[in-house]
Amino acid sequence: MAEQKINTTESGSTASILSIRGLQKSFDSLSVLKDISLSVDRGNVISIIGPSGSGKSTLLRCATFLEHADGGDILYDGQYALKDGVYASKAELNRFRTRFGLVFQNFNLFPHYSVMRNISEAPILHGENREEVRERAMMLLKKMGLEGKENAYPCQLSGGQQQRVAIARALAINPEILFFDEPTRALDPELTGVVLKVIRQLAEDKMTMVVVTHEMPFARAVSNRVIFMDGGVIVEQGHPEEVFGNPTQERTRQFLRNYQQ
């Protein structure tokens, strides 16, 4: 991967914590992201919807450097992480990684770590005071409705509890933006409601979030903007009432009709 120092000057909107411009990604001959552009303003919730294979998760993985894009720009707070397909240095990318938290559909907790260690490991490794981190972790567990679970191990928790631990872990580094990749897909309906309630509370607290989801009523209720993707492109985006209530594109209407049936 080519690297160079590309943040000699600031660029982009100060209101946008994340800006993506002309992002492209292919796997071999398959183009999965085609000229994707979007921005995420502070305090906003962006929901990304669309059929399986539309590029939603790949977009999140590129935005968080889990996949390397082939072209385009990625900026955090106006600073380039990717410029014209060239990435910033490893040191700069590591600095950008402290700005965001990630929550996946399969929890990704360390099975041999206690709940407390799962939550506190990253900030301690970043040099934060151990006692301060523990205090923050206890506050997060209370916020997640998991008081008394700090010494439990993932295998002793339900799927919904594990996902709430994963959210607490993502919040423990005090991120500026949270990314969720289908956080309820592996959960049964009852546990789904508990996790969505937590994310809804984060939205009310003005946590900046990008959420890939198949939970349409949730996306409509909590989002500032909804993005519909299909075939590696953004087909339509706008206010949730516009996208869900009066979509302008036939493909969007077809997707929503099929989903409701």
Q: Where is each model-derived feature located?
A:
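Helix-to-loop junction immediately C-terminal to a conserved catalytic motif
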Residues: T64
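Conserved ABC transporter NBD signature motif
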Residues: G72-D84
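Short coil-to-helix segment of the ABC ATPase nucleotide-binding domain corresponding to the Q-loop/switch region
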Residues: Y113-E121
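Conserved signature/switch motifs of ABC ATPase nucleotide-binding domains
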Residues: A152-C155, I173, D205
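Catalytic Walker B motif of ABC-type/P-loop ATPase nucleotide-binding domains
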Residues: L178-D181
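ABC ATPase "signature
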Residues: Q237-G238
